[in-house]
From Swiss-Prot:
GO biological process: argininosuccinate metabolic process; L-arginine biosynthetic process; urea cycle
Protein name, entry field: Argininosuccinate synthase
Catalytic activity: L-citrulline + L-aspartate + ATP = 2-(N(omega)-L-arginino)succinate + AMP + diphosphate + H(+)
Chain sites annotated for binding ATP: A8, Y9, S10, G11, G12, L13, D14, T15, S16, A34, G115
EC number: 6.3.4.5
Binding site for L-citrulline: Y85, N121, R125, S178, S187, E268, Y280
Species of the source: Thermotoga neapolitana (strain ATCC 49049 / DSM 4359 / NBRC 107923 / NS-E)
Taxonomic classification: Bacteria, Thermotogati, Thermotogota, Thermotogae, Thermotogales
Subcellular location: Cytoplasm
Quaternary structure note: Homotetramer.
Top-tier EC class: ligase
Amino acid sequence: MKEKVVLAYSGGLDTSVILKWLCEKGFEVIAYVANVGQKDDFEAIKEKALKTGASKVYIEDLRREFVTDYIFTALLGNALYEGRYLLGTAIARPLIAKRQVEIAEKEGAQYVAHGATGKGNDQVRFELTYAALNPNLKVISPWKDPEFLSRFKGRTDLINYAREKGIPVKVSKKRPYSEDENLMHISHEAGKLEDPMYIPDEDVFTWTVSPKEAPDEETLLEIHFEKGVPVKVVNLKDGTEKTDPLELFEYLNEIGAKNGVGRLDMVENRFIGIKSRGVYETPGATILWIAHRDLEGITMDKEVMHLRDMLAPKFSELIYNGFWFSPEMEFLLAAFKKSQENVTGKVIVSVYKGNVMPVARYSPCSLYNPELSSMDVEGGFDATDSKGFINIHALRLKVYRLTKKGYEK
């Protein structure tokens, strides 16, 4: 009996060649295709996998789970890698790998496989998830396999092999970028973008219009949260209302994209140490991130917020590096869930030509006291108390300065 392997399959050149290569090595290959919002013809992918040699093909719609259990979860901790990247690719990988493991267990497969390269982050994200969820599964990673690497040294070898084996190869002109698309974002890398001084042409962007070409009128959105989780969005101009999590997120993508929101061009640090330039389009998540952060301003205790903000970079790093299913992540998520207990209310944001600006907010759990904050009303605050407050904090500074002068003499 052949040993079984569950392959994370996209229908592209790399994973199609890997599928056939695994079949030739004597494996029974089960192809797994995850729909996380990419614009693909899934029936065509299924047909291609079967013709290439897969014994079975799983195609699953994971979009709703992706939104509720991954995108919204990352929002609780204000995940933002290196202060800029909203982690669209990184957040999707643990979900895909988790289902791959579950299918392997269901099918009695001994192996899981993926087509991620040996230079990127995805190989780590997939394999750490496999290890965390089922340490007994064996991993086949062809782009780190000496036998595979000796046979396929580049794209030309892959194309020649595919044609030799009757695997359909698209002859249409391919976009000169490496792209990853899901419900949260689309990323563009490689090609001309590898030159950090190259200014991307407008044709790089496929989701968002240029802010310069966006409508001349703002869109006002009222976004509601319960304990940090988005529950409703209302367009205050036309009355459109969305409460279903998936529909809500898709609608924010639509509004953000047509208003030029969510573009990012940055050089980031990959986990393995290589610097990489990425151009991202993340419209809906950008709107949510800004609105959520604004609501926290009136609902979170100062010290809780500052402590959470200290943990947020580590949280983002764990997601980026593939540690979604780790004990440290469990700890952080428990802390973030606690921090969001009062983050309930609504924020009105103005979406206009690439910008998202909060303009109003309300919460039944608000810690904002107009009388305390007023420049004109005391509101129970005795201003003379500030003198002692300042003196206490100044003591350390005075001692430091006087001591330093003594040393210098």
